Regions:
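Short acidic (Asp/Glu) and glycine-rich catalytic loops that position anionic groups and cofactors
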Residues: 4-5, 50-55, 72, 120-124, ...
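Short beta-strand-to-loop capping motifs
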Residues: 5-7, 61-65, 158-160, 221-223, ...
């Protein structure tokens, strides 16, 4: 069982982020002996944590017991009636403060956190979080716990050995213990990231650990809103580049011990990352070698023999369409589409089909257009973590971020200048998505409200085609409600329980 709780009354900024994290910690503290430990002895796994957007939390329960619903209900009852013990609060606050200070001691993690602070609409530096924690009192957290349930929205995935009636019963009992009302349409929490302008944007940051010897250079290329075609290219590019990147920069040039590339989809905005960690070379030299490799990679693809390209492409398709190994893997796959609130349970199938049709030349041209550092058309962010042997330049074109030193934190200012990309996904689209009318107008409206924007500028001509709309109509028709007319989930302001589609990914 998985539950995602959205709470619009979480305050903005670092103080609100720490409130939700300490709230979760105090819930864990309260249920540890009475609920968590007995559940653990019974073979159940329970985890609760703040959501990635800090606008709620996620509760997950796994196990073979038929008491999972009772455990979930116990957690929700505790959360909606939480009383803060001052002594336990101070203990948990101290633990969290230590975690905040230690999180970015690793330079690679430091670089990732710096990028998140730059991009995410709702994020803050570790220093801001630490300051917020130090100012927080037990009374602040109690007021927060009493006020956040004015409006709430809970989405759940229940999968495994339970019937629809049992699932509806769990949902109804949890709904009954929620004291507030549904979230108004104009109050939904937003999860957006900054729109990186065209060009290169460099940020130099001093390592937090004064004795650190490893430098890190992290490249990030923003590609725009997530589409099937965009995901297909970026997933294929990762597989094509990974081995050659490691061979060139790690094996041949011995640039650094850790060399990697990966695709990114923070809040359903596509990006591509390349990272190198080096103890021997200054960040500007590491960056120059990374840029040289990326500039040469389209030509490497052009010269790649057809058999090798076909083999790599087919392996990517096979991996996407592979059967789930167990129920947990299947649940995680479905849950990802609920968390991003796009509900595109068939997305992997469409992405795999597009990958199978991408030619070697198309892959090389795509790389030339999007994954080229310092090119005018690319949207490129470069984060440099400077260790003690290679300090941050006193003068230069780089921005200096307040992430462990005394420099001015310009992340909030930059996000105001850069602007934000549109919100992706919509939780209120569930009912239309699951129960579409036969009319094409309703189907098109359901598609638009679930984030597959057929009229967006980022969509290609192929994605706008009538055949895609027809395919969406077929997909939507497969998602049918199983609830009876008298089911509690049919009441006003609620959505139906439904059976997840059978096609893989």
């Amino acid at each position: 069982m998985y539950f995602q709780v959205s709470l619009p009354h979480v305050p903005e900024g670092a103080f609100g982020m720490m409130l939700i994290q300490l709230f979760v910690a105090m819930v864990e503290d309260c249920v540890n002996e009475s609920v968590y430990y007995p559940a653990h002895l019974a073979g159940m796994e329970v985890d609760i944590g703040a959501s990635a957007s800090y606008s709620g939390f996620v509760l997950s329960l796994e196990g073979l017991s038929d008491k999972l619903g009772e455990v979930a209900l116990s957690y929700f009852k505790t959360m909606t009636s939480l009383k803060i013990d001052a002594d336990r609060f101070e203990k948990r606050k101290e633990e969290r403060l230590r975690d905040v200070h230690n999180l970015c001691l690793n330079p690679a993690r430091h670089a990732k956190r710096a990028l998140e602070v730059l991009l995410k609409q709702k994020d803050a530096t570790q220093e801001d979080k630490a300051n917020a924690l130090q100012e927080m009192t037990a009374a602040d957290l109690q007021a927060f716990a009493d006020g956040i349930w004015q409006h709430a929205h809970v989405e759940s995935l229940m999968i495994g050995n339970l019937t629809k009636d049992e699932a509806c019963d769990v949902g109804e009992r949890i709904r009954a213990c929620l004291p507030g009302a549904p979230i108004p349409d104009n109050s939904w929490p937003e999860t957006r990231i900054a729109r990186v302008p065209q060009g290169a944007h460099l940020f130099s940051i001093k390592a937090i650990n004064a004795d650190e010897t490893n430098n890190v250079v992290l490249y990030y290329f923003q590609l725009g809103e997530s589409t099937w075609r965009g995901r297909a290219f970026i997933i294929l590019m990762q597989s094509l580049m990974h081995e050659k990147l490691f061979d060139q920069l790690r094996t041949k040039e011995t640039l650094g011990y850790s060399v990697s590339c990966s695709f990114d989809s923070t809040h359903e905005i596509l990006g591509y990352r390349v990272s190198v960690e080096s103890a021997f070379h200054p960040p500007h030299f590491v960056s120059s070698r990374m840029a040289a490799f990326l500039r040469s990679f389209p030509e490497i693809l052009d010269n790649m023999d057809d058999a090798s390209y076909e083999k790599t492409r087919q392996s990517v398709v096979d991996d996407i369409l592979a059967d789930d190994v167990n129920l947990r893997e299947e649940a995680i796959r479905h849950w990802a589409h609920l968390v991003n609130q796009k509900y595109q349970f068939h997305r992997g199938r469409h992405v795999a089909q597009i990958i199978s049709e991408i030619s070697k030349r198309e892959a090389a041209d795509w790389c030339r257009e999007f994954i080229q550092p310092f090119a005018p058309g690319s949207r490129h962010v470069s984060v440099h973590i400077h260790a003690k042997n290679h300090p941050v330049p006193a003068n230069g074109s780089e921005h200096a971020l307040g992430m462990g030193d005394a420099h001015f934190d310009i992340s909030a200012e930059l996000k105001n200048v850069w602007g934000l990309l549109p919100q992706q996904g919509c939780a209120t689209a569930v009912e239309e998505l699951i129960m579409p009318d036969s009319s094409s107008g309703t189907i098109h409206r359901a598609v638009a409200r679930t984030g597959q924007n057929l009229d967006a500028d980022t969509e290609s001509t192929q994605d706008k085609s009538l055949s895609l709309r027809s395919q969406w109509a077929a997909d939507l028709a497969e998602m049918r409600s199983e609830c009876g007319a008298s089911c509690a989930c049919r009441r006003a302001k609620t959505g139906p329980v439904f059976v997840l589609p059978t096609p893989k990914k």
